[in-house]
Amino acid sequence: MSDLCVGINGFGRIGRLVLRACLQKGIKVVAINDPFIDLQYMVYMFKYDSTHGRYKGEVSMEDGKLIVDDHSISVFQCMKPHEIPWGKAGADYVVESTGVFLSIDKASSHIQGGAKRVVVSAPSPDAPMFVMGVNEDKFDPSSMTIVSNASCTTNCLAPLAKVIHDNFGIEEALMTTVHAYTATQKTVDGPSAKAWRDGRGAHQNIIPASTGAAKAVGKVIPELNGKLTGMAFRVPVADVSVVELTCRLSRPGSYAEIKGAVKKAAEGPMKGYVGYTEYSVVSSDFIGDTHSSMFDAGAGISFNDNFVKLISWYDNEFGYSHRVADLLLYMHFKE
């Protein structure tokens, strides 16, 4: 068990799975804040999950606290981050998983409540962005209080792009993520004034959408800044997404050599973050997979030694939540 104590703000899809990931990794979660979920409902929501299954341990409530196995977790329902008594609860770090307080200015409100650092579980417009296995060594504990764990798609794409760029060089690349639907979409057609297609029924359609994930790679791998862009298709599956990366390489490499480079990384410096498979897999095979990026060796194609299409799967919920937990541990270690 780590001596790191963590609070979670927002007990939605990512907040609940970050709690699961922290429990698996021995991180002590001491407090949860969500103004829209009372304690009794919190017990129910954590215990039962339609995608990842019932929590295998014991979940209950006692004396106004959430009890998970033998862990007692304080519960708050504050609307404003600065009102949450993180310090009183003993939370050193806070995972900001509401999707609302993304900027340094807004996320810094948690510091007023007694937290020492904040990890935003989404892309931030101005906070330093980290992808485990790619650029976590750039974390500076002396100057970085608010950081971002980037997006689930960037966490899948960046490690793969790093392996390819380090071994063959990327001249330019296009990415498409075929992405599971999320809570921001509509179950049936509804209003979406800014992006009309986003308002169409999520389980009825393949929906072209925008994503900043490819451009964000340039923030974590500066040498690739301006060399990648991409788009998304939202598709009717509840979990697991897949990145398709089409690259023009600087140095020629056969598809066999590319597979070898990714496999070497998956078994070496990126073990746990990048996976490698040659099985004939489909999306549901990766529900609950904790890798950031699972390279599908059998699905990619090579047009020639300088032009390739690479495929990598990711559990956009569970894999990402494990990276949040890993970043917490890494930051604590660096302190």
From Swiss-Prot:
Residues that, per the record, bind NAD(+): 13-14, 34, 79, 121, 316
Residues where S-nitrosocysteine is found: 152
Catalyzed reactions: D-glyceraldehyde 3-phosphate + phosphate + NAD(+) = (2R)-3-phospho-glyceroyl phosphate + NADH + H(+); S-nitroso-L-cysteinyl-[GAPDH] + L-cysteinyl-[protein] = L-cysteinyl-[GAPDH] + S-nitroso-L-cysteinyl-[protein]
Function summary: Has both glyceraldehyde-3-phosphate dehydrogenase and nitrosylase activities, thereby playing a role in glycolysis and nuclear functions, respectively. Glyceraldehyde-3-phosphate dehydrogenase is a key enzyme in glycolysis that catalyzes the first step of the pathway by converting D-glyceraldehyde 3-phosphate (G3P) into 3-phospho-D-glyceroyl phosphate. Participates in nuclear events including transcription, RNA transport, DNA replication and apoptosis.
Keywords: Apoptosis, Cytoplasm, Cytoskeleton, Glycolysis, NAD, Nucleus, Oxidoreductase, S-nitrosylation, Transferase
Name of the protein described by the UniProt record: Glyceraldehyde-3-phosphate dehydrogenase
Quaternary structure note: Homotetramer.
GO molecular function annotations of the record: glyceraldehyde-3-phosphate dehydrogenase (NAD+) (phosphorylating) activity; microtubule binding; NAD binding; NADP binding; peptidyl-cysteine S-nitrosylase activity
Subcellular location: Cytoplasm, Cytosol; Cytoplasm, Cytoskeleton; Nucleus
Source organism per UniProt: Oncorhynchus mykiss
Domain of life: Eukaryota
UniProt keyword Translocase, yes or no: no
Gene Ontology terms describing biological process: glucose metabolic process; glycolytic process; microtubule cytoskeleton organization; neuron apoptotic process; peptidyl-cysteine S-trans-nitrosylation; positive regulation of canonical NF-kappaB signal transduction; positive regulation of type I interferon production; protein stabilization
TM segment ranges: none
Enzyme Commission code: 1.2.1.12, 2.6.99.-
Active-site feature positions: 152 (nucleophile)
